[in-house]
């Protein structure tokens, strides 16, 4: 019995060692409730997992992430914001502000992001843009700058809207991209992490307290920021950023259930974060490959005799910055970053120093994640009639 028990212990030890050396591949993402979902690398912007990631859908109050960012970038916290009739008439959820009331912009940002007040969003939009329509134009301009490909904002609060550009919508991928940008703003993060906030209008006669509706902050370790949303058309929506195991993830969910299924978004967000933690690790660009030397015809041979006759070889340089080399990418264990070059087989003189000759590309899963120009390290002159005369003179008279 002792021998068998010892053998069993040895067997189990061997299994554990093998599992540590060859860890099993983590399971794929379990079935999600959301109609559209994205898990994004918050540092590189790469989509790690997508379900209908590029499908245009209404996104309800997750719109307010963009509203808040523009207010932070274009306004000042101590600005006086006056409430218009249009702002005061917005439907629930609302702060209940009255036409003519004044607030500090900073206070309204807490109302906007913690309790998701629709009247607050319109008041902010009118203050920053002059009107809701002009503010929507700023929102759409910013979305394009961030790389969004199918986003159109009409309202600052995410309520259904339509104009000459189409209906109010985004995609899970674009929404994740917007959050990846927003999480870099420390004031945005501070506001959205606040659990409770009390403020008054400028007169000091009316006080308000708002509570954060983003329960995921206290449900999941590492959640940095997030924004919930719901309309009858959009369903429950959610976008958040989380840093887990030193990895920055962005989760975006659209159409994640309707009334009666309010907690579906928390379940889906957890599944995506678990998938990211268990499947991805950080890597940087690999060592820059050695670039070939390009033959140049009709060129003055150099003094190092690297060329012969009327040709020489051109050394190349790839301008890869330290910032690019330090940038991190989340990769699966089975993924690698590879280099590819686009270079001509030969050139004709003259060639200028730093002249662009081609390009160097880093690719991950067949998609380009980085590129830079490849340039000439030195200049190469073209052989001329005068060069031939001087050459003959040197060869025969010296």
Describe each model-derived feature in a short phrase:
Residues 3-4, 101, 105, 385:
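Structural motif marking the loop-to-transmembrane transition
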Residues 2-25:
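Sec-dependent N-terminal signal peptides of Gram-positive bacterial secreted proteins and lipoproteins
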């Amino acid at each position: 019995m002792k021998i068998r028990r010892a053998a069993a212990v040895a067997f189990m030890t061997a299994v554990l060692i093998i599992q540590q050396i060859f860890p099993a591949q983590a399971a794929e993402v379990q079935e999600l409730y959301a109609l559209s979902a994205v898990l994004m690398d918050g540092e590189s912007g790469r989509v790690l997992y997508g379900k209908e990631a590029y499908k245009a859908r209404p996104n309800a109050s997750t719109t307010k992430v963009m509203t808040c960012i523009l207010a932070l970038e274009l306004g000042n916290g101590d600005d006086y914001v006056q409430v218009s009739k249009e702002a005061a008439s917005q439907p629930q959820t609302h702060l209940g502000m009255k036409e003519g009331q004044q607030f500090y912009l900073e206070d309204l940002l807490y109302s906007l992001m913690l309790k998701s007040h629709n009247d607050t969003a319109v008041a902010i939009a009118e203050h920053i843009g002059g009107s809701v329509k002009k503010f929507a134009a700023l929102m759409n301009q910013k979305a394009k700058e961030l790389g969004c490909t199918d986003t159109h904002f009409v309202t600052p609060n995410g309520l259904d809207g339509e104009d000459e550009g189409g209906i109010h919508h985004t995609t899970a991928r674009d929404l994740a991209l917007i959050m990846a940008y927003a999480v870099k703003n420390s004031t945005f993060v501070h506001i959205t992490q606040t659990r409770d906030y009390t403020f008054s209008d400028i007169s000091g006669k009316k006080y308000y307290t708002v509570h954060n509706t983003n329960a995921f902050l206290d449900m999941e370790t590492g959640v940095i920021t997030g924004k919930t949303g719901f309309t009858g058309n959009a369903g429950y929506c959610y976008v958040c950023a989380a840093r887990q195991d030193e990895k920055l993830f962005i989760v975006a969910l659209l159409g994640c259930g309707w009334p009666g299924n309010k907690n579906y978004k928390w379940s889906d967000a957890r599944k995506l974060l678990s998938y990211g933690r268990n499947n991805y690790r950080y890597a940087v660009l690999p060592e820059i490959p050695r670039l070939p030397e390009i033959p140049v015809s009709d060129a003055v041979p150099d003094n190092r005799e690297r060329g012969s006759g009327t040709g020489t070889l051109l050394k190349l340089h790839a301008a890869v910055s330290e910032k690019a080399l330090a940038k991190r990418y989340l990769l699966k264990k089975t993924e690698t970053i590879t280099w590819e070059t686009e270079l001509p087989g030969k050139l004709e003189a003259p060639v200028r120093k730093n002249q662009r000759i081609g390009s160097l590309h880093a690719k991950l899963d067949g998609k380009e994640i980085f590129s830079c120009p490849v340039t000439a390290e030195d200049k190469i002159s073209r052989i001329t009639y005068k060069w031939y005369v001087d050459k003959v003179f040197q060869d025969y008279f010296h």
